[in-house]
Amino acid sequence: MELSATGATLSEAFTRIALGLFAAAVDPDTVGDSDTREVRAHGVGLPALLHAWLQECLYVHEVEGFACRSLEFAVFETAPSAGGEALRLHAILRGEEIDPIRHRVLAAIRNVSRDGLSVESGSKGFSLRASLEL
């Protein structure tokens, strides 16, 4: 399954692609926002950060059984530093634990593939692509 997202800013595109991952797994119209989870990711370069971000979101969903409705970034550092430190982000996810009776589960996602990952910038903002293994 292919995911793609665009945004005027990089953080907007990262938000949209993560919400796309969650929406591919559970119908977001059935998810409330009574609980939160924190997700942190880091990577050397934007494709590595994107992969780590989606893997962490997938972990929260598949292992912790959490369905996400919305998210916001507390930290979004994507400017390379002189010391070569990894890019990093920290987000607060809003949603709730998956309830098979209330939530319409759409797909079981096994992995985020490194193949097909891309982060591109253009005059209208950013475009992200990722492949999910079902």
Feature map (PLM): residue ranges:
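N-terminal intrinsically disordered, cationic/polar leader segments
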Residues: M1-G7, S11-L134
